[in-house]
Design a protein with these regions (language model features):
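Short FAD-binding loop at a beta-strand-to-alpha-helix junction that anchors the flavin cofactor
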Residues: 216-218, 277-296, 448-453
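A short alpha-helix-loop-beta-strand transition element characteristic
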Residues: 33-49, 100, 166-174, 321
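N-terminal FAD cofactor-binding segment of flavoenzymes
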Residues: 2-58
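Extended, hydrophobic alpha-helical segments in both membrane/secreted and soluble proteins
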Residues: 279, 283-289, 301-315, 443, ...
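Predominantly flavin-linked oxidoreductase catalytic cores and closely associated redox partners
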Residues: 2, 10, 80, 84-85, ...
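Flavin (FAD/FMN) cofactor-binding core of flavoprotein oxidoreductases
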Residues: 252-273
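Active-site-proximal substrate-binding core of FAD-dependent oxidoreductases
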Residues: 2-4, 16, 291-297, 309, ...
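Ferredoxin-type iron-sulfur electron-transfer modules and their immediate structural context
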Residues: 41-56, 331-458, 479-483
Length: 483
């Protein structure tokens, strides 16, 4: 019996909401589409060399490339374009794709199982009233729903909680990745070059680093990832990224160029010990919705693809979710996560101890019996009154964008100012009382799009939500200390 497969895509087209610029391992693609290199995706550059540096404010030194970050045989791609390219292959195989529709809720059957998704109402104003363009949402019924909505998706979050899928796993931990695609001056990009840095502008207590992927046509994808388990309530990941761009190693590459696009998205960093159960009545989780990203490799695309392919094989054979969790955990996806399971939590005690742990785990291929624990990111934030600010030695900036609002201009997300506010605070009074005193309103700094802003009214300070700025990175949902 043939299965009907439908993909619900919230972007106007497949790939529209994907942050482009990534290095992929081609193994799963080789299995899925043998001969794909004869007709590759629109942007596909073989990696020609790796560089990794430790940065100080005005200096640097080259580090040996760890085995996990050696990219010989891998490809630099535009991930958005690659997703669109894959969509064409899927449609040719009979998959129905519906772009421009966001799954707003889960449809449950009478016995409490997942029975599909609910597409939200469209054409509603900020007060919830229908406009001329109103279209009522619809229910999509399905015997099995595959959640592939990425990191901290709101439907996946609901299901993980409802079915207690994380009951036997550690708390998930995350990073915030901010990325820009630049058109640099002719001759500055070296197609195929992959660069990573650690160190400045981060202090040694904050996990993170950068990536620069050199593509063709004078384009480079440049980005910065910060672990969201940081303690400093005044830290701004966006500012750290902009500071990094002004390092003497990086700034000459960007001077004379221009930003093409930008965006931000959280990534799952918990790995092996934070992976929830990935099956439930009527549904399964794949990719970053489950948390399959390999942090030491700084890669998740091949893991997401492999988990999706396993899901397809499983459902083609059984037509039901039961057994998929066992299948995933017995697969190369889980084996890859197990080998590196202690590297990310090894950095909880700082950069140098993290490097030492990473070296031990790499040498032993993760065969030591220990498994280091993960902690919920929001629990790691310290009170403002008791936190001693480090001297970050940050510099004056002159590269674009000038601030977070200017960065939002280049993002691929767009909102109607009159649409319903999708960000809701359960108790706004906490923001102006407890949070102001205890944490100095960290949301005004950890948000990369300046969605949250403390303003003075006649009645005193209040938190203003600039929802139209939102780039849907999910940082606020993760780092809010009160949850």
């Amino acid at each position: 019996e043939d299965l009907m497969v439908a993909v619900i895509e919230k972007g106007a087209e497949v790939g529209a909401h994907i942050l482009s610029g990534a290095v992929i391992e081609p193994g799963p693609l080789d299995e899925l589409l043998p001969g794909w290199k004869d007709q590759p995706p629109p942007v596909c550059v073989p990696v020609e060399g790796d560089q990794i540096y430790y940065l100080k404010k005005n200096g640097r030194f080259r580090l040996p490339t760890p085995p996990q970050q050696k990219n010989h045989g891998n490809y630099i791609v535009s991930l958005g374009a690659m997703c669109g390219w894959l969509a064409g292959h899927a449609e040719a195989a009979g998959v129905d794709i519906f772009p421009g529709f966001a799954a707003a809720g889960i449809r449950y059957t009478d016995d409490g199982a997942v029975g599909g998704v609910i597409i939200g109402d469209m054409g509603v104003d900020i007060h919830g009233n229908p406009k001329d363009t109103y279209m009522q949402g619809i229910e999509i019924h399905a015997p099995v729903t595959v959640l592939a909505e990425g990191c901290r998706g709101h439907l996946s979050k609901e299901l993980i909680s409802k079915f207690e899928l994380d009951r036997d796993s550690d708390p998930q931990t995350y990073g915030i990745g901010i990325k820009e695609l630049w058109k640099v001056a002719p001759g500055k990009a070296t197609p195929g070059r992959v660069q990573h840095t650690v160190g400045w502008p981060l202090d040694r207590a904050i996990y993170g680093g950068s990536f620069i992927y050199h593509m063709e046509d004078d384009q480079v994808a440049i980005g910065f990832v910060c672990g969201l388990d940081y303690a400093d309530p005044d830290f701004s990941p966006f500012e750290a990224f902009q500071q990094f761009k002004h390092h003497p190693l990086i700034k000459p590459l960007l001077e004379g160029g221009e930003i093409i696009s930008s965006g931000a998205r959280t990534i799952t960093e918990g790995g092996y010990q934070s992976l929830p159960r990935v099956e439930m009545p009527g549904a399964i989780l794949v990719g970053d919705a489950a948390g399959t990203l390999n942090v030491p490799k700084i890669k998740g695309t091949h893991q997401a693809m492999r988990s999706g392919m396993l899901a397809a094989e499983h459902l083609a054979e059984t037509s039901k979710p039961a057994g998929f969790d066992e299948r995933l955990r017995a697969s190369p996806v889980m084996a890859e996560l197990h080998k590196v399971r202690n590297i990310r939590p090894g950095f909880h005690k700082g950069l140098w101890k993290g490097f030492f742990t990473a070296a031990i785990e790499t040498i032993t291929a993760g065969k030591l019996k220990r498994t280091l624990p993960q902690h919920a990111d929001h629990s790691q934030l310290q009170r403002a009154s008791g936190f001693e600010q480090p001297d970050r030695q940050w510099v004056e900036r002159d590269l674009a964008p000038r601030d977070r609002l200017a960065s939002v201009y280049f993002a691929t997300t767009a909102h109607d100012e009159d649409q319903p506010v999708h960000l809701q605070i359960l108790d706004p009074e906490v923001c102006t009382t407890r949070c102001s005193i205890e944490f100095n309103n960290p949301c005004t700094r950890f948000c990369p799009a300046q969605v949250y802003e403390m303003v003075e009214d006649v009645d005193g300070p209040r938190l203003q939500i600039n929802a139209a700025n939102c780039v849907h990175c999910k940082t606020c949902d993760i780092k809010d200390p009160y949850q």
